[in-house]
């Protein structure tokens, strides 16, 4: 086996271990934020939505800067620094008793993500061969689902005792992950050339096709982020107990572990990437509309199942399609900018979703936020259809990236 092949094989295992630590650290804390501050402390959902939206916007909106700096200086220092910063954000969140302190903790967490997320995604592009990336993304997403359930279960158990224990566990996991990267991650360069920060950013911004695609995905992310805000609140309201939230993530894990990889393998040679993305988005949009009318857990979990199935279809295609549009000379910059749709959609989804949820309760119309999200999904579906009908995209891809 050549040294390059050996490095790629070892790199796969490194990426999988690193990803599991990050997923566990994230899902121990974030799914429980809305339960802690809305249900237990009685805050308005919009206040928590602002915090979650701020984290999302900082991490994803500034991702192009983190990616461009990583193109210049390499992945390792950015990843280690970012993970330690997220640990500090979680530690601060544990003592948050005022909205401004929660917002500050989410700001720190998001800034840490800005530093470590783009170079981690660029490492996938560097280490995984183009023909293998679609399947590797499916493995990562299956791992995400399993990690989400384990993290949510652990966080829910710790929440029975003290929310500070939840945040401490999340911080410890990110510190362990920082040590893991500092110890084992080689000083790899991300791009084929050591691209200056400004040059990498210029390459991305001048790529109109990539920019249009990324911005269009904002509508997709408005739906996707509700897994962290409105869906847990809805499950808690219907069930009358925050313990039911873990079953929501268990459903996601079961569907992902059983369907994600087989669907990706079966569809990659039969359907174009854009058709898979649009089909998944359509299912997600249709499942959103009736959620506000669900009167029991059986109805609610059925709709959540449909939503997750749509996500299982769409996510690998979205990742792979994003990868096909990258430039190898500025991988970090592309990976960073590709997060802008998530930054915009996530911020609007969290803040707007929280506001609509509160408004729906005030007006005694709980279906209001879900109807609006369904409409946004349909608009995004049409926008993607128009874009893809004018610009052909490849069935496979050449180049890649990833909500945490």
Curated annotation (Swiss-Prot):
CDD domains: MFS_MdtH_MDR_like. Coiled coil: none annotated. Residues 1-12, 117-138, 186-213, 265-276, 321-339, 389-404 are cytoplasmic. GO terms for molecular function: transmembrane transporter activity. Its main location: membrane. Keywords: Cell inner membrane, Cell membrane, Membrane, Transmembrane, Transmembrane helix, Transport. It is found in: Cell inner membrane. The chain crosses the membrane at residues 13-33, 99-116, 139-159, 165-185, 214-234, 244-264, 277-297, 300-320, 340-360, 368-388. It is a multi-pass membrane protein. One of its GO terms (cellular component) is plasma membrane. Residues 34-98, 160-164, 235-243, 298-299, 361-367 are periplasmic. It comes from the Bacteria. Belongs to the major facilitator superfamily. DHA1 family. MdtH (TC 2.A.1.2.21) subfamily. PANTHER family: MULTIDRUG RESISTANCE PROTEIN MDTH, RESISTANCE PROTEIN MDTM, PUTATIVE-RELATED-RELATED. This is Multidrug resistance protein MdtH. It comes from Salmonella arizonae (strain ATCC BAA-731 / CDC346-86 / RSK2980). The lineage of its organism: Bacteria, Pseudomonadati, Pseudomonadota, Gammaproteobacteria, Enterobacterales. The gene is mdtH.
């Amino acid at each position: 086996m050549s040294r390059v092949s050996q490095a790629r094989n070892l790199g796969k295992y490194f990426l999988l271990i690193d990803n599991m630590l990050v997923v566990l650290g994230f899902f121990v804390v974030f799914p429980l934020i809305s339960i802690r501050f809305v249900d237990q402390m009685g805050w308005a959902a919009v206040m928590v939505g602002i915090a979650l939206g701020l984290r999302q916007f900082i991490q994803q909106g500034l991702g192009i800067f983190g990616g461009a700096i990583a193109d210049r200086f390499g992945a390792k220092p950015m990843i280690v620094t970012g993970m330690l910063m997220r640990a500090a954000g979680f530690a601060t969140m544990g003592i948050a008793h005022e909205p401004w302190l929660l917002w500050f903790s989410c700001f720190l967490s998001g800034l840490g993500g800005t530093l470590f997320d783009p170079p981690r995604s660029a490492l996938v592009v560097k280490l995984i061969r183009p023909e293998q990336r679609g399947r590797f993304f499916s493995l990562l997403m299956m791992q995400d689902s399993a990690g989400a359930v384990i993290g949510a279960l652990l966080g829910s158990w710790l929440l029975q005792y003290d929310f500070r224990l939840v945040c401490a566990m999340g911080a410890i996991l990110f510190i362990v992950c920082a040590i893991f990267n500092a110890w084992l991650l080689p000083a790899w360069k991300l791009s084929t050339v050591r691209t200056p920060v400004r040059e990498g950013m210029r390459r991305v911004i001048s790529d109109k096709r990539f920019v249009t695609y990324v911005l269009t995905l904002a509508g997709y992310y408005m739906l996707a982020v509700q897994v962290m805000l409105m869906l847990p609140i809805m499950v808690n309201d219907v069930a009358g107990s925050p313990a039911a939230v873990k079953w929501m993530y268990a459903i996601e894990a079961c569907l992902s572990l059983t369907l994600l990889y087989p669907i990706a393998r079966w569809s990659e040679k039969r359907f174009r990437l854009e058709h898979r993305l649009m089909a998944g988005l359509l299912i997600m949009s249709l499942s959103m509309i009736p959620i506000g009318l669900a009167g029991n857990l059986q109805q609610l979990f059925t709709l959540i199942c449909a939503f997750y199935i749509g996500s299982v279809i769409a996510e690998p295609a979205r990742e792979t399609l994003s990868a096909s549009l990258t430039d190898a000379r500025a991988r970090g910059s592309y990976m960073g900018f590709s997060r802008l749709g998530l930054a915009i959609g996530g911020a609007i989804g969290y803040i707007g979703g929280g506001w609509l949820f509160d408004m729906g309760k005030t007006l005694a119309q709980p279906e209001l936020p879900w109807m609006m999200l369904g409409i946004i999904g349909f608009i995004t579906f049409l926008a993607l259809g128009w874009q893809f009908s004018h610009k052909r995209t490849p069935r496979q891809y050449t180049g890649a990236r990833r909500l945490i």
